[in-house]
Amino acid sequence: MTISKWPACERPREKLLESGAAALSDAELLAVLLRVGAAGKSAVDLARELLHRFGSLTALFAAQGQALAGVRGMGAAKFAQVQAIPELARRALAESLRLPSGFDSPDSVRSYLRLTLAPLQHEVFMCLFLDPGNRMVASEELFRGTLTRTSVYPREVARQALAHNAAGIIVAHNHPRGTTAPSQSDIHLTRELARTLDLIDVRLLDHFIVAGHEIRSLAESCERLPGL
């Protein structure tokens, strides 16, 4: 049965308009975005199939075209729709971090880093450059590595900080198939970054590690890094 023949109170779009987006399940929200399904398959059926196949929204949004092409009803247009969601979310969060009150909420920073780093299957080291008012002036991926490691050069981080006239920096990297527990090299790198940046009067505010849905602040959790 097509969604148009469902009772109005059960149709995802009408349910959203009546009760708000929070009242919908993940599959129902995804169905609103997809709009239509395929022959013999409603948009809700298609959404449920996608969530079942990929296991989570995070994995679905990180999926590439070839993986999605294996699902009947997922053409280029729907792939583009699915890919647009996390990118819009990242841009909205980045926009909020550029406001005067952006860094008043640590959750916004964590959410932005999760959205950016969690889906990646290789290690990435990124920097958020802040002005004296703690507004983000730039967000850049500086180094990219393999599944298990990446090489980071503190002098290049310092050079970019000067280029952006930054007063402070937040750095982050991901552990694609690991945990957020910092390695000895993570601790050593953070110390080296703090020392190098101190020479140019730029403060390293924090170093975050992202692994899946988890995120760890080394400034909050690591006793071996006093002063961050």
Swiss-Prot record:
Binding site for Zn(2+): 173, 175, 186
Keywords, sorted A to Z: Hydrolase, Metal-binding, Metalloprotease, Protease, Zinc
Domain of life the protein comes from: Bacteria
Alphabetized InterPro entries for the sequence: MPN, RadC_JAB, RuvA_2-like, UPF0758, UPF0758_N
Motif, JAMM motif: chain positions: 173-186
Boundaries of every MPN domain copy: 102-224
One of the GO biological process terms: proteolysis
GO MF, any single term: metallopeptidase activity
Family listed: Belongs to the UPF0758 family.
PANTHER family: DNA REPAIR PROTEIN RADC, UPF0758 PROTEIN YEES-RELATED
Name by which UniProt lists this protein: UPF0758 protein RALTA_A2508
